[in-house]
């Protein structure tokens, strides 16, 4: 029944939205806002306009509608006192249709108060354009700089029109309020771009100046600036906060769109809760109210329910114009139909204007649409009434095949290989997209459309729609909201609601704040124990300063990972901004406020324990000031890191920048480089460094006004025991000759240039920094739109791109309009399609034949069960079947019937549960160890490495999965053959890439199939939902491809979800499972599925209508479609049928006869893997190296971090002198060299996880290569890059610091330089192995990063720099000895500092007076000879003493002996080996499936 012939009353009565007894079904309702109060005259006009049966019929419809409305109470459903159960969303009798009618009548009762609004859209000459690159080359490490430089220069040049191409060619359309429009086209046709343009969501492309778009008189600028939430674009992806419940997610959206004019006495909370409940009841989500939304990694609602949450959230925005981009993705056809009915009802009753781009649209769904837009490569080839589109194209000369849906027919016209002209019209119909458009623009339908649009534009200019709409918009807004604002509630109300949502997120996953607080407490205990109970003496001055410095360092570091949560939330915040729910700045401010309690608890849990265990100044005032400054440090650094995150577009860039900034702040805080020793060029850094002011205040707070007993005197030791005090001096800076104490104030003044008067001043400066960075962060969030989405392009290697462009130029002959833009790879012209079809049928390489398969795989009584909540549940129940060469068997069933489970059981891929009964046989024999290598399994997900080309992916599979006896040339020839067979020649050298920049959906699916085919599966090919998520034409082409493979002798078993009649015709047999994994049918389909139809009709099914889709009819018959019920149990019908007996007899016959055939006794056929281990290892390692090489972002971010940090440290400590502070600085330069450790690991982890995902999801189950080859390849392939990085770091750090100069006196510059290079490169190799160890036993990157950070922090603390072995408590001494950094630092310091002379700076000399009658030589000489150091005699007779004269004395004090440098290097290398061994062990322990499920079954 077409839309044109459907009256309003029929829509309301014959297609009810909701079955009151089934709250789980998707019910028809969409969009609640002030548009509900349109007057009856508008409704009558629309009805009259839409009717094809005359005015009398329309009048009857209107009268009937008014009669229905008279029965509606028109009461407010929001006040909580709901007298009608049909209006209560929590009632089982809730009726969404009744609820909407009631709401409409309520609004009509006081239209002046509710101020209803509606919005249509019309456009003429609409053109969208972007950069003319539908193909580009993949940057590598060698050409990336050149590419980025040329792109930057091109941006600075005057725009060149030749660089742009039209995504949407000039087009015209009008969508009036109350009309539902569908947009049809193949992927890349411009459907998404059209919807984004209408929704004023044009970031990433441009709109032509000649384009005219009006929204009932409003311009796109008006919509973007003032009414953004009234015109929305809903993307096909589902992004939500995973730890927020469904109810909280929808109530949050409802609160932010709650209007001011919601009715008297109704508070916002009541209104929002009621609206959210209505939507949950309408879309069958009520039972999920308290369930987390979840995502791919967090358990939550199902994928289909998550899609419905997205739909409900978008609907709650109350938008007048809704642009839905493939919103039915992930929904089965019945649920999708219910959603479209909801859109239709929304348009009909509430006068909304929905547009939807949809794939695989059923006929029932299509008949609900008022208008249809058909796009072909960016050209609009039709716009008009949906009921007239088919007739238009048939009149053009195209044939619509029997049982093909209208939507599929319209879309198929844009596919040259699929469309079919009527006899006699072969030379008359248009062929190219431009010819189709020319035909359309010369048609009378187009002339009528342009006339209607022109009249609409004139009407918009005459009417005062803008002011009326503004009044309606302002009436909805809360108090203190600017009338020009697109938001419904005020800024501070937005902040309040987002704060509440953030607390709910914490409640949904309290583990994150709890673990953060507990980890801070544990780290406080561990770190404080290192400096435990410091004595109040001068020999603890360095350690006391080090303890304060590390507390600042830890508090600053604690906010670094906030960048990750910022990027995680950014897509959701951007979506909500487009829905006009709240400003990004409101979210920024709210996130800081909501996280403040957790931050304060974190600082308390660390700092309270740390402060008192270290024995810092124990007075209340000093403690609270310390805690105040540490909390301020956390806030300042949090705001700074957030600002960096807000100004960048990638996590890698943000983390690298943050690390360099943090490094600068630590070095110039005043401890690592005290102010007197900061070089002149860099003094400005300390003035803009907030950590400098914080550290100075903490040092003043600890030392000012205190006296410390001297811990060590000069001279001291044997012979000086009874020396009077006036003749000795304390060794500490700031000491006074003859005094037994040192003034703390004097010490920090002379050693650090810290002044007590700066204490509270610095606090004020810190607060100013916090406010400044807060303002910067909040402001930046408003302007950062994230990485710009590029158009769909295909990436090649640079050399391959040149060949591709030459080929494209030759085929297009310079005319961009002659075919696809810039040689677009998605489409071919008709001649190419025909030629390619003929070419591939013959095969391009006559010497290569498809593997002949004569073996038959069959199974009998297969039963599988899993344990769920301590209960064994049967998933498959005695399933029988077979797959023969040359046949395609379809595996169908309802969701949850066990289709994928059956595939996994048949292919031996089950990882849980037990096969309790049944046999799986090949030619009558049990499965052997080579079975998994003998099959191909095409998974539903297309999992590939993004930097691999199509040809490389196929070659990799062929090299490792084909027999090792076959030569490389033969394998390469076979790969070429499969490329031709799958019609992938045009993009064989293209990279897989990512969505938008790489292969499209169809090309990825073909590659997935190809990877399995090149393995030469001699037995059969499994395909799991190969058409899922594809448009109907792509699904059809995949099925044609399967048919071609079967015709070449391949046996195929394929699961498929509700196929069209055309797709069903490609299958030979059907195995249908009903709920519980029970067989309802197994047998031939027959021509037009007649054999299957006859079977069900024979056993009592209603006859199949001639025009019906047999698949959908069968689903209705067996009760597998939503809302349908079977007349009988078809499992029992099957088991008692003669057809079942025939199947059993055939299985028994095959077992008896086939088992007599000779078996393949080739020993290689029984191997678990086709290739030997060494070959697996080499190929996997090389692939990983190539992946890194083609990921210049990864390599350059690593290089930039290494070069910037090494140079920064090197020049900050530039040619440090060999005095007391200089030695200290050189040691801390080594310490700071290790600080970027965690960032190196954070950069590496995502790439490891990408490889692991491909291996574990696809390559491991197919026995491509072993787990040992995978982990070994990952480890060793990273080492060459680390050696290069270490070499660069060596030159950037070692020479600027000046350590090489210490080797000059002993003429050992070369030997010590080589050892230093080995040490530094070993450090970088260690970082990669540590990262791989952390991720080897963790599923999530965050957990691995946290583990690595914790281990790294402990290594730094116990390495002997901040606290030596003589200070570390005895309990922790094992941490010092088993710490790899201990030996590395000792080796680096001994190699860099040994055997050099020390000369104290003047401020480092201590002065003392010799006893009466003695000279400096006689008095101090014996001491310096025994203890080391040197002295000089001053003019006044006093002695100036430097306590050391050789770097070896300093090295001995920190246990870094030059004689042990090679031993220490060897120990550190051993730690690298331990990392590698543990990585392999933990990967095997945590990730490799153990045991043999076949053995378990036999037990």
From Swiss-Prot:
Gene3D superfamilies: P-loop containing nucleotide triphosphate hydrolases
Positions of the ABC transporter domain: 148-402, 857-1101
Sequence positions that bind ATP: 893-900
Matching SMART domains: AAA
Keyword Nucleus tagged: no
Keyword line: ATP-binding, Membrane, Nucleotide-binding, Repeat, Transmembrane, Transmembrane helix, Transport
Compartment annotation: Membrane
Example of a GO biological process term: xenobiotic detoxification by transmembrane export across the plasma membrane
Bilayer topology term: Multi-pass membrane protein
GO cellular component, one term: plasma membrane
One GO MF term: ATP binding
InterPro entries (UniProt xref): AAA+_ATPase, ABC2_TM, ABC_trans_N, ABC_transporter-like_ATP-bd, ABC_transporter-like_CS, ABCG_PDR_1, ABCG_PDR_2, Drug-R_PDR/CDR
Transmembrane portions of the chain: 512-532, 546-566, 596-616, 621-641, 660-680, 763-783, 1194-1214, 1229-1249, 1279-1299, 1315-1335, 1354-1374, 1465-1485
CDD domains reported in the protein's UniProt record: ABCG_PDR_domain1, ABCG_PDR_domain2
Residues exposed to the Cytoplasmic side: 1-511, 784-1193
Source organism superkingdom: Eukaryota
Function: Multidrug efflux transporter. Confers resistance to azole antifungal agents, to other antifungals (terbinafine, amorolfine) and to a variety of metabolic inhibitors.
Family: Belongs to the ABC transporter superfamily. ABCG family. PDR (TC 3.A.1.205) subfamily.
Protein name listed in UniProt: Multidrug resistance protein CDR2
Gene that this polypeptide is encoded by: CDR2
């Amino acid at each position: 029944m077409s839309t044109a012939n459907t009256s309003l009353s029929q829509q309301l009565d014959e297609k009810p939205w909701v079955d009151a007894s089934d709250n789980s079904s998707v019910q028809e309702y969409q969009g609640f806002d002030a548009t509900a109060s349109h007057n009856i005259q508008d409704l009558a006009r629309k009805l009259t306009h839409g009717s094809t049966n005359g005015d009398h019929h329309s009048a009857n419809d209107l009268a009937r509608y008014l009669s229905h409305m008279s029965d509606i109470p028109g009461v407010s459903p929001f006040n909580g006192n709901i007298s009608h159960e049909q209006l209560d969303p929590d009632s089982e009798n809730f009726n969404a249709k009744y609820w909407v009618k009631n709401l409409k009548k309520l609004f009509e009762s006081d239209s002046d108060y509710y101020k209803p609004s509606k919005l249509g859209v019309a456009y003429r000459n609409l053109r969208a354009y972007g950069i003319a690159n539908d193909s580009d080359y993949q940057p590598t490490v060698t050409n990336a700089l050149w590419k980025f430089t040329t792109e930057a220069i091109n941006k600075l040049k005057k725009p060149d029109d030749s660089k742009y191409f039209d995504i949407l060619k000039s087009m015209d359309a009008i969508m009036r309020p109350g009309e539902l429009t569908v947009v049809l086209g193949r992927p890349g046709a411009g459907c998404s771009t059209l919807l984004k343009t209408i929704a004023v969501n044009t970031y990433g492309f441009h709109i032509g100046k000649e384009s005219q778009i009006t929204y009932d008189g409003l311009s796109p600028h008006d919509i973007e600036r003032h009414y953004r939430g009234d015109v929305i674009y809903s993307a096909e992806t589902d992004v939500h906060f995973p730890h927020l419940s469904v109810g909280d997610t929808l109530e949050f959206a409802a609160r932010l769109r709650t209007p001011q004019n919601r009715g008297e006495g109704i508070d916002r909370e009541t209104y929002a809760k009621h609206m959210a409940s209505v939507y949950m009841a309408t879309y069958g989500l009520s039972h999920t109210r308290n369930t987390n939304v979840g995502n791919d990694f967090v358990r939550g609602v199902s994928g289909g329910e998550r899609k419905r949450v997205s739909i409900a959230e978008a609907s709650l925005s109350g938008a007048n114009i809704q642009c839905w981009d493939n919103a039915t993705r992930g929904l089965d056809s019945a649920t999708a139909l219910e959603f479209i009915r909801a859109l239709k009802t929304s348009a009909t009753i509430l006068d909304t204007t929905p547009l939807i781009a949809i794939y695989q649209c059923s006929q029932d769904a299509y008949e609900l649409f008022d208008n249809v837009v058909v796009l072909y490569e960016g050209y609009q080839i039709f716009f008009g009434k949906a009921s007239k589109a088919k007739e238009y194209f048939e009149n053009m000369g195209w044939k619509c095949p029997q049982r093909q849906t209208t939507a599929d027919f319209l879309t198929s016209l844009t596919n040259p290989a699929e469309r079919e002209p009527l006899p006699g019209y072969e030379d008359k119909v248009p062929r190219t997209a431009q010819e189709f458009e020319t035909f359309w623009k010369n048609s009378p339908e187009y002339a009528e459309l342009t006339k209607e649009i022109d009249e609409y534009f004139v009407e918009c200019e005459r009417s005062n729609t803008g002011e009326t709409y503004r009044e309606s918009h302002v009436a909805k807004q809360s108090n203190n909201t600017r009338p020009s604002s697109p938001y419904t509630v005020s800024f501070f109300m937005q902040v309040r609601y987002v704060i509440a949502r953030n607390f709910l997120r914490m409640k949904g996953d309290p583990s994150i704040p709890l673990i953060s607080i507990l980890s801070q407490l544990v780290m406080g205990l561990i770190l404080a124990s290192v400096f435990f109970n410091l004595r109040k003496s001068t020999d603890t001055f360095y350690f006391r300063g080090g303890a304060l410095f590390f507390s600042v360092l830890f508090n600053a570091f604690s906010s670094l990972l906030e960048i990750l949560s910022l990027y995680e939330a950014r897509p959701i915040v951007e979506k909500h901004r487009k829905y006009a729910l709240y400003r990004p700045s409101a979210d920024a401010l709210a996130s800081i406020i909501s996280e403040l309690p957790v931050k304060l608890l974190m600082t308390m849990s660390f700092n309270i324990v740390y402060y008192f265990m270290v024995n810092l100044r124990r007075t209340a005032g000093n403690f609270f000031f310390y805690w105040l400054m540490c909390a301020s440090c956390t806030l300042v650094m949090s705001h700074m890191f957030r600002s960096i995150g807000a100004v960048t577009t990638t996590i890698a860039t943000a983390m690298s920048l943050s690390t360099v900034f943090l490094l600068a702040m630590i070095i110039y805080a005043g401890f690592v480089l005290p102010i007197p020793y900061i070089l002149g060029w860099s003094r400005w850094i300390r003035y803009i460094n907030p950590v400098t002011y914080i550290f100075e205040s903490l040092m003043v707070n600890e030392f000012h006004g205190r006296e410390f007993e001297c811990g060590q005197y000069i001279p001291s030791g044997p012979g000086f025991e009874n020396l009077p005090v006036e003749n000795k001096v304390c060794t500490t800076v700031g000491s006074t000759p003859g005094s037994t104490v040192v003034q703390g104030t004097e010490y920090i003044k002379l050693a650090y240039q810290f002044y007590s008067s700066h204490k509270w001043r610095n606090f004020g400066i810190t607060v100013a920094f916090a406010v400044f960075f807060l303002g910067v962060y909040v402001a930046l969030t408003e302007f950062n739109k994230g990485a710009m989405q590029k158009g769909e392009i295909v990436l090649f290697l640079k050399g391959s791109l040149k060949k591709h462009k030459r080929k494209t130029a030759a085929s297009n002959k310079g005319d961009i309009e002659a075919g696809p833009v810039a040689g677009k790879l998605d489409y071919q012209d008709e001649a190419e399609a025909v030629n390619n079809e003929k070419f591939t049928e013959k095969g391009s390489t006559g010497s290569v034949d498809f593997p002949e398969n004569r073996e038959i795989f069959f199974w009998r009584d297969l039963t599988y069960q899993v344990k769920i909540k301590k209960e064994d549940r049967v998933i498959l129940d005695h399933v029988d079947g077979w797959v023969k060469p040359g046949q395609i068997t379809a595996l169908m069933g309802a969701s949850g019937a066990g289709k994928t489970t059956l595939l996994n059981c048949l292919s031996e891929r089950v990882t849980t549960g037990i096969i309790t009964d049944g046999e799986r046989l090949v030619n009558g024999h049990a499965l052997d160890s080579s079975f998994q290598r003998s099959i191909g399994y095409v998974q539903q997900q297309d999992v590939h490495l993004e930097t691999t080309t199509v040809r490389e992916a196929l070659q990799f599979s062929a090299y490792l999965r084909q027999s090792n006896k076959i030569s490389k040339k033969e394998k390469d020839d076979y790969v070429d053959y499969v490329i031709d067979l799958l019609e992938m020649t045009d993009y064989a050298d293209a990279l897989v890439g990512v969505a938008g920049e790489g292969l499209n959906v169809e090309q990825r699916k073909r590659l997935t199939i190809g990877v399995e085919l090149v393995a030469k599966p001699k037995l059969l090919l499994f395909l799991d939902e190969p058409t899922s998520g594809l448009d109907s034409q792509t699904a059809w082409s995949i099925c044609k491809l399967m048919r071609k493979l079967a015709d070449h002798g391949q046996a195929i078993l394929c699961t498929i979800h509700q196929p069209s009649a055309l797709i069903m015709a490609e299958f030979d047999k059907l195995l249908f499972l009903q709920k519980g994994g029970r067989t309802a049918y197994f047998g031939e389909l027959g021509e037009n599925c007649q054999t299957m139809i006859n079977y069900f009709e024979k056993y009592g099914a209603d006859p199949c209508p001639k025009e019906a889709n047999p698949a959908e009819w069968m689903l209705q018959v067996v009760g597998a479609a939503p809302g349908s019920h079977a007349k009988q149990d078809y499992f029992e019908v099957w088991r008692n049928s003669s057809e079942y007996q025939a199947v059993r007899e055939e299985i028994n016959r095959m077992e008896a006869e086939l088992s007599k055939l000779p078996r393949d006794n080739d020993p290689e056929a029984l191997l678990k893997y086709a290739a030997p281990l060494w070959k697996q290892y080499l190929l996997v390692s090389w692939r990983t190296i190539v992946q890194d090489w083609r990921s210049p972002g990864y390599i350059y971010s690593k290089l930039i971090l290494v070069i910037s940090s090494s140079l920064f440290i090197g020049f900050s400590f530039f040619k440090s002198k060999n005095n007391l502070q200089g030695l200290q600085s050189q040691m801390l330069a080594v310490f700071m060299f290790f600080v970027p450790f965690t960032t190196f690991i954070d950069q590496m982890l995502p790439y490891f996880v990408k490889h692991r995902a491909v291996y574990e999801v696809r390559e491991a189950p197919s026995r491509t290569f072993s787990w040992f080859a995978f982990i070994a390849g990952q480890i060793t392939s990273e080492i060459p890059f680390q050696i290069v990085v270490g070499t660069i770091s060596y030159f950037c750090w070692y020479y600027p610091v000046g350590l090489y100069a210490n080797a000059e006196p002993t003429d050992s510059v070369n030997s010590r330089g080589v050892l230093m290079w080995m040490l530094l490169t070993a450090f970088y190799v260690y970082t990669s192995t540590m990262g791989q160890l952390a991720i080897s036993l963790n599923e999530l990157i965050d957990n691995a990063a946290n583990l690595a950070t914790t281990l790294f922090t402990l290594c730094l603390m116990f390495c002997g720099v901040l606290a030596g072995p003589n200070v570390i408590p005895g309990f922790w001494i094992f941490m010092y000895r088993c710490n790899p950094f201990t030996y590395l630092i000792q080796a680096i310091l001994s190699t860099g500092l040994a055997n050099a002379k020390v000369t104290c700076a003047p401020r480092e000399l201590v002065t003392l007076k010799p006893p009466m009658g003695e000279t400096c030589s006689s008095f101090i000489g014996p001491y310096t000879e025994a203890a080391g150091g040197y002295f000089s005699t001053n003019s006044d007779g006093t002695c100036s003493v430097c306590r050391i004269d050789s770097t070896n004395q300093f090295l001995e004090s920190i246990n870094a002996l030059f004689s042990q440098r090679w031993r220490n290097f060897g120990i550190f290398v051993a730690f690298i080996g331990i990392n590698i061994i543990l990585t392999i062990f933990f990967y095997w322990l945590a990730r490799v499936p153990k045991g043999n499920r076949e053995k378990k079954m036999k037990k």
